[in-house]
Amino acid sequence: PSFNYLVNSSHYIDYNYNLQSPNNEIVTQIGGTVRLAKLFDTQFFVDFYKIDHYTYFNSSSLPQQSGSSLNISQIGGESTLKYGKFNLNGKVLFQKALNNENLLPMPDFIGRINLFYQTKAFKKAADIQAGVKVYYFTKFASREYSPILNEYILPSATAYSIGGQPIADVYINMRVKRMYFYVEGQHIN
């Protein structure tokens, strides 16, 4: 685990701790990617993660280490479709903690679509890209941020759930030689 999990000395009495006899986290990843370049530049992937001795902060902001492994599976894909100067890029991810799901809250589904127009301008001296991105992820009780620890802690019983609604952003970016301009309106919906 990182040093922040091992020991903390604070003026706030509730934030003084020392994690006794910690074990090293062991992360094992098995997975692969299949690319189908002929079909809209598409790729699919599958990943499986096994994390032994997973270290986390509980809802009381105290470091803990899991006695059993945390197993996570992910299946997803990405595809890009081009038609003239219009581009459509979509990405999906299905993920699930197979056990100890309360130790690492996460959305079961994450999706993103990016529709943009890309062209050259000013006698081909500039590249311009303008578009809209839409994100969505399923509702889940997210971990809470502790500014005293500068870490995320497990959600409390009264935790606020996030997700379950789309988020849309609009943007325009331009590159002229070595200079980049980027303007984005986030969460316009």
PLM feature spans:
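Exposed, low-structure sequence patches enriched in small/polar residues
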Residues: P1-N189
